[in-house]
Curated annotation (Swiss-Prot):
<comment type="function">
    <text>Catalyzes the hydroxylation of 2-nonaprenyl-3-methyl-6-methoxy-1,4-benzoquinol during ubiquinone biosynthesis.</text>
</comment>
<dbReference type="GO" id="GO:0008682">
    <property type="term" value="F:3-demethoxyubiquinol 3-hydroxylase activity"/>
</dbReference>
<feature type="binding site">
    <location>
        <position position="90"/>
    </location>
    <ligand>
        <name>Fe cation 1</name>
    </ligand>
</feature>
<keyword id="KW-0479">Metal-binding</keyword>
<feature type="binding site">
    <location>
        <position position="174"/>
    </location>
    <ligand>
        <name>Fe cation 2</name>
    </ligand>
</feature>
<dbReference type="InterPro" id="IPR012347">
    <property type="entry name" value="Ferritin-like"/>
</dbReference>
<keyword id="KW-0408">Iron</keyword>
<feature type="binding site">
    <location>
        <position position="87"/>
    </location>
    <ligand>
        <name>Fe cation 2</name>
    </ligand>
</feature>
<dbReference type="Pfam" id="PF03232">
    <property type="entry name" value="COQ7"/>
</dbReference>
<feature type="binding site">
    <location>
        <position position="171"/>
    </location>
    <ligand>
        <name>Fe cation 1</name>
    </ligand>
</feature>
<dbReference type="GO" id="GO:0006744">
    <property type="term" value="P:ubiquinone biosynthetic process"/>
</dbReference>
<keyword id="KW-0560">Oxidoreductase</keyword>
<comment type="similarity">
    <text>Belongs to the COQ7 family.</text>
</comment>
<dbReference type="InterPro" id="IPR011566">
    <property type="entry name" value="Ubq_synth_Coq7"/>
</dbReference>
<comment type="pathway">
    <text>Cofactor biosynthesis; ubiquinone biosynthesis.</text>
</comment>
<keyword id="KW-1003">Cell membrane</keyword>
<keyword id="KW-0503">Monooxygenase</keyword>
Amino acid sequence: MVFDELISEFDRGLRSLTGISRMSRPVPAPAEAPAAELTPAERTHAAGLMRVNHVGEVCAQALYQAQKLTARTASAKAMFEEAAREEEDHLAWTAHRLKELDSRPSLLNPLWYAGSLAIGVAAGALGDKVSLGFMAETERQVESHLEGHMSELPAADTASRAIVDQMRIDEVKHGKAAADAGGIELPLPARMLMRAASKVMTSTAYYL
């Protein structure tokens, strides 16, 4: 059973890194067509933001894969699996939008993935309550990050905005579920370290 799990997660990891993630839900569609075409500068900025969001989903896949494999209880495993499945939708949606913007994923995705996998293993090793608390805090920070992107994305980029808004809704749900399942609040130094690491990732991925 453990071997089967490892094979399954290895396959999911390969899909995350090669851009062939499966989506269980269609790409969110904007409520209305854009009033104007994006300017070249707006396309470049939108692509940078969506590349950052794509990297975040690569990291989420690695985190939740590791946390699922190290979870002690069946309920925690199921929660990480459900979150990973929805995050795989996000991964596919952001990859799709990057192609539409004539852009590409981050060149450093293997590095982001490996680092997040190690962090997920470390969180899981501390027990389910800590691991779920890490998930809840991660989702809170991602929610804040996505809200920032909603204010930064060009008003005319209704396609990207529809994707980011649905991602935000999903992240709120994941964070609440993890907290309700018994995830503990992480100490302030841990939360600050997470924000600092996220800042490095987002500022780098925007360009690379």
